[in-house]
Amino acid sequence: MNYSQFLNMIPEATLMVVLLITFFADFCSSKSADRKWFNPLVCLLMVAHIVINIFPTEATEAFGGMYTTGPAVGVLKTILALGTLIVMVQAKEWLSRKDTAFKEGEFYMLIISTLLGMNMMVSANHFLLFFLGLEMASVPMACLVAFDKYRHYSAEAGAKFILTATFSSGVMIYGISLLYAACGTLYFDDVAKVISASPLTIAGMVFFFSGLGFKISLVPFHFWTADSYQGAPTTVTGYLSVVSKGAAAFTLCAILMKVFAPMVEYWTVLLYIVIVLSITIANLFAIRQSDLKRFMAFSSISQAGYIMLAVVGNSAMSVTALTYYVLIYVVANLSVFTIISSVEEHNNGTVMMDSYNGLYKTNPRLAFLMTLALFSLGGIPPFAGMFSKFFVFMAAVQGADIHTTLGAWAYGVVFIALVNTVLSLYYYLLIVKAMFIKHSDNPLPTFQSACSTKLALAICTVGIVAFGICSYVFDWISVAANA
């Protein structure tokens, strides 16, 4: 074996170093002692990992072409690492509790392991490596969902997550086997050269799409998503809703545009149906929720529909719009979950929407930051969420102009998505109304968030404002996608 090819895997290599240092630091230190240094150490290691890999690299490959990387993949890995860093920072307050402090090292190692699996997944150029990366991410994620295993809801959420992941993996591997039977190869490039529309390949594509649809929580593959989000620790729910979803969506986009390019008319119709169902049904269910974590679960399903809307364009603009949307979604959604986690810690574990009544009077800063994040998720200008939705719509419209036979369908889907944007604004404003207008006989007391929570909120808020105003962020992603 030529070991020099490992030099082409710098992001994965640096993550392995971070994982090993975290393991030895946890192993060699006493868990009974006050380890205030542990969280800063892991966060600094993640910052070093991001700095080393922030600049897009040239297209390289390893292991006979099974592993490939390039500027666009490098940018996405940086975004995923940024999201993981924010989760680690905000997790400090939660991991300081007596019932979780002794598991702090395990949490960091599990979350780094999931990120390592996602990196392998997005760099895969072979269905086998893709599946291995996916499982590398899914197994530690199941452990994270059931991290509070002695809480009934967390154990139930973990069981449901494992069952869903197992079923989706089985569906996906069956689709891959059909594609192998039809094409005789598992390399993405080779499959793209020989694949053509036939009952076998169409069935394989549908099964593969369905398997990843479960990972992204698209309708109708969203079963138990809300239950898993509600039962998992809030910090894990935030990670699950953005980082893993972003990696799976990018991978599905790349495979559809690269491997299934000759079958574009088939998967485009499939996407249209799934996008409309995901955005519409999730919005309608979100309005009915009183539990804020279930509320954000249906919000994330709707956001997944918007993310996949970019794929309809089937061009470099699609990759740019999707990656930019994931970046904005990471900072906005994690800002919301950071506030939910902080309020939960100071309100006896309550995450009901009624507990936010009058939050502005007792904790005005948190209410203001929550409003900024919700406005960004809803696409209200001048926040970054508005620009991300604009670029997604623009990518979809460009796809309508390219694919004339399905152009009318694309315009119809974009129109439905625009209408649903108004609907999503309504249910996001329900939380704003609760914080600023509604009164409570037993309001949440005034409290000071931990320094780590303040830092996480600062990073997210700067991202919400700056990523929309600073055009070089979009240009950075666009240059990488077109390289």
Where are the language model's segments positioned?
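Alpha-helical transmembrane segments of multi-pass membrane proteins predominantly involved
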Residues: 1-483
